[in-house]
Design a protein with these regions (language model features):
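Hydrophobic core residues within well-ordered beta-strands of beta-rich domains
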Residues: 45, 70-72, 128
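The feature marks short-to-medium sequence segments in extracytoplasmic or secretory-pathway proteins
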Residues: 77-128, 156-159, 167-171
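Short, solvent-exposed beta-strand/turn "edge" segments of beta-rich domains on protein surfaces
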Residues: 55-71, 82, 121-123
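Bacterial N-terminal signal peptides that target proteins for export
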Residues: 1-12
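Low-complexity, acidic Ser/Thr/Pro/Gly-rich terminal tails and inter-domain linkers that flank the onset
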Residues: 34-66
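Bacterial signal peptide processing site
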Residues: 24-27
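C-terminal motif of bacterial Sec signal peptides marking the signal peptidase cleavage site
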Residues: 19-22
Length: 172
Protein backbone atom coordinates (compact mmCIF):
# COMPACT_ATOMS: atom_id res chain seq x y z
CA UNK A 1 0.00 0.00 0.00
CA UNK A 2 1.40 3.37 -0.97
CA UNK A 3 1.91 6.12 1.62
CA UNK A 4 -0.73 8.86 1.71
CA UNK A 5 0.19 11.98 -0.31
CA UNK A 6 1.21 14.18 2.66
CA UNK A 7 3.19 11.40 4.28
CA UNK A 8 4.72 10.53 0.94
CA UNK A 9 5.88 14.09 0.35
CA UNK A 10 7.49 14.20 3.81
CA UNK A 11 9.02 10.80 3.21
CA UNK A 12 10.53 12.07 -0.04
CA UNK A 13 11.94 15.13 1.68
CA UNK A 14 13.62 12.92 4.27
CA UNK A 15 14.70 10.36 1.70
CA UNK A 16 16.05 13.10 -0.55
CA UNK A 17 18.59 14.06 2.09
CA UNK A 18 19.77 10.45 2.23
CA UNK A 19 19.59 10.04 -1.54
CA UNK A 20 21.55 13.19 -2.26
CA UNK A 21 24.17 12.27 0.30
CA UNK A 22 24.58 8.91 -1.39
CA UNK A 23 24.85 10.47 -4.83
CA UNK A 24 27.63 12.80 -3.86
CA UNK A 25 29.69 10.10 -2.19
CA UNK A 26 29.14 7.13 -4.50
CA UNK A 27 26.46 4.56 -5.20
CA UNK A 28 24.69 2.48 -2.57
CA UNK A 29 25.50 -1.22 -3.08
CA UNK A 30 21.87 -2.20 -2.39
CA UNK A 31 20.50 -0.07 -5.23
CA UNK A 32 19.17 -1.86 -8.30
CA UNK A 33 20.81 -0.40 -11.43
CA UNK A 34 19.26 -0.15 -14.88
CA UNK A 35 20.00 1.39 -18.28
CA UNK A 36 18.01 3.40 -20.82
CA UNK A 37 15.31 1.19 -22.35
CA UNK A 38 15.18 -1.30 -19.46
CA UNK A 39 11.78 -1.94 -17.90
CA UNK A 40 11.92 -1.44 -14.14
CA UNK A 41 9.35 -3.29 -12.00
CA UNK A 42 8.46 -1.61 -8.70
CA UNK A 43 5.89 -2.68 -6.10
CA UNK A 44 3.13 -0.67 -7.86
CA UNK A 45 4.07 -0.17 -11.49
CA UNK A 46 6.57 -0.83 -14.25
CA UNK A 47 8.38 2.05 -15.91
CA UNK A 48 10.63 2.42 -18.91
CA UNK A 49 12.72 5.44 -19.83
CA UNK A 50 12.37 5.54 -23.61
CA UNK A 51 14.45 8.61 -24.37
CA UNK A 52 16.63 11.18 -22.64
CA UNK A 53 17.96 14.37 -24.19
CA UNK A 54 19.71 17.55 -23.15
CA UNK A 55 18.63 20.88 -24.55
CA UNK A 56 18.60 24.58 -23.73
CA UNK A 57 14.84 24.92 -24.38
CA UNK A 58 11.87 22.58 -24.12
CA UNK A 59 8.23 23.46 -24.71
CA UNK A 60 8.94 27.17 -24.28
CA UNK A 61 10.95 26.76 -21.06
CA UNK A 62 14.51 28.09 -21.39
CA UNK A 63 17.27 26.88 -19.08
CA UNK A 64 19.02 29.34 -16.79
CA UNK A 65 22.51 30.61 -17.63
CA UNK A 66 25.03 27.83 -16.92
CA UNK A 67 22.35 25.14 -16.87
CA UNK A 68 20.83 22.73 -19.36
CA UNK A 69 17.51 20.93 -19.43
CA UNK A 70 17.49 17.15 -19.25
CA UNK A 71 14.23 15.80 -20.66
CA UNK A 72 13.40 12.25 -19.58
CA UNK A 73 10.62 10.52 -21.53
CA UNK A 74 9.06 7.61 -19.70
CA UNK A 75 6.15 5.20 -19.81
CA UNK A 76 4.46 3.94 -16.64
CA UNK A 77 2.17 0.89 -16.45
CA UNK A 78 0.28 0.11 -13.26
CA UNK A 79 0.67 -3.43 -11.93
CA UNK A 80 -1.20 -2.73 -8.67
CA UNK A 81 -4.91 -3.64 -8.17
CA UNK A 82 -5.74 -0.19 -6.73
CA UNK A 83 -5.17 3.38 -7.92
CA UNK A 84 -1.73 4.71 -7.01
CA UNK A 85 -1.17 8.41 -6.25
CA UNK A 86 1.90 9.58 -8.16
CA UNK A 87 3.95 12.77 -8.02
CA UNK A 88 6.45 14.18 -10.50
CA UNK A 89 8.90 14.27 -7.59
CA UNK A 90 8.73 10.46 -7.27
CA UNK A 91 11.53 10.44 -9.85
CA UNK A 92 14.67 12.41 -9.03
CA UNK A 93 17.87 13.04 -10.92
CA UNK A 94 21.38 13.39 -9.53
CA UNK A 95 24.98 13.66 -10.70
CA UNK A 96 28.36 12.87 -9.18
CA UNK A 97 29.41 16.39 -8.14
CA UNK A 98 25.98 17.36 -6.81
CA UNK A 99 25.84 19.18 -3.47
CA UNK A 100 23.41 18.04 -0.77
CA UNK A 101 21.38 21.26 -0.87
CA UNK A 102 20.92 21.32 -4.67
CA UNK A 103 17.18 21.32 -5.42
CA UNK A 104 17.66 20.78 -9.15
CA UNK A 105 17.20 17.04 -8.51
CA UNK A 106 13.43 17.69 -8.68
CA UNK A 107 11.57 18.24 -11.97
CA UNK A 108 10.85 21.83 -12.97
CA UNK A 109 7.30 23.00 -12.26
CA UNK A 110 4.61 21.72 -14.61
CA UNK A 111 4.37 24.10 -17.58
CA UNK A 112 3.49 22.06 -20.72
CA UNK A 113 1.14 19.23 -21.70
CA UNK A 114 3.97 16.78 -22.48
CA UNK A 115 5.05 16.75 -18.82
CA UNK A 116 3.70 14.33 -16.27
CA UNK A 117 1.49 16.35 -13.89
CA UNK A 118 2.70 17.42 -10.46
CA UNK A 119 0.23 14.91 -8.94
CA UNK A 120 -1.89 12.26 -10.66
CA UNK A 121 -3.60 8.91 -10.13
CA UNK A 122 -2.33 5.82 -11.93
CA UNK A 123 -5.41 3.57 -12.19
CA UNK A 124 -5.15 -0.23 -12.11
CA UNK A 125 -3.63 -1.50 -15.39
CA UNK A 126 -3.38 2.10 -16.70
CA UNK A 127 -0.46 3.08 -18.91
CA UNK A 128 0.72 6.68 -19.03
CA UNK A 129 3.56 8.34 -20.91
CA UNK A 130 5.08 11.76 -20.45
CA UNK A 131 8.25 13.66 -19.78
CA UNK A 132 9.98 15.00 -16.71
CA UNK A 133 12.16 18.07 -17.23
CA UNK A 134 15.12 18.77 -14.96
CA UNK A 135 17.34 21.87 -14.93
CA UNK A 136 20.91 20.76 -14.22
CA UNK A 137 24.46 22.16 -14.60
CA UNK A 138 25.50 22.30 -18.25
CA UNK A 139 28.92 20.84 -17.43
CA UNK A 140 27.35 17.50 -16.44
CA UNK A 141 26.76 14.72 -18.98
CA UNK A 142 25.93 11.63 -16.90
CA UNK A 143 23.02 11.36 -14.48
CA UNK A 144 21.33 8.92 -12.13
CA UNK A 145 17.53 8.77 -12.44
CA UNK A 146 16.11 7.36 -9.20
CA UNK A 147 12.83 6.02 -7.83
CA UNK A 148 12.59 5.05 -4.13
CA UNK A 149 9.73 2.89 -2.83
CA UNK A 150 8.06 3.83 0.46
CA UNK A 151 5.50 1.61 2.17
CA UNK A 152 2.81 2.65 4.64
CA UNK A 153 3.88 1.30 8.03
CA UNK A 154 1.79 3.62 10.19
CA UNK A 155 4.55 6.23 10.53
CA UNK A 156 4.72 9.65 8.88
CA UNK A 157 7.84 8.69 6.91
CA UNK A 158 6.83 5.22 5.77
CA UNK A 159 9.16 2.25 5.44
CA UNK A 160 11.72 2.54 2.62
CA UNK A 161 11.60 -0.26 0.10
CA UNK A 162 13.76 -0.84 -2.94
CA UNK A 163 15.58 1.97 -4.71
CA UNK A 164 15.92 1.85 -8.49
CA UNK A 165 18.71 3.78 -10.20
CA UNK A 166 19.01 4.26 -13.94
CA UNK A 167 22.25 5.62 -15.36
CA UNK A 168 21.46 8.12 -18.12
CA UNK A 169 23.61 9.97 -20.65
CA UNK A 170 21.39 12.41 -22.56
CA UNK A 171 21.74 12.96 -26.30
CA UNK A 172 22.24 16.60 -27.24
Amino acid sequence: KKVAPIGKRLAWVLASALLLTGCSSGQNDTDQHFSLGDTVSTAWFDYTVTEVESTQEYGGYISAQGDQLVVVELTLKSTYPQAVTMFDSDFQISWDSMSQDDTRCMPVEYYCDQQLPTEYELAPRESRSGVLVYQVPDDQSTFQFTFQEFFDDGTQEGRPGDQYVMDLTPQA
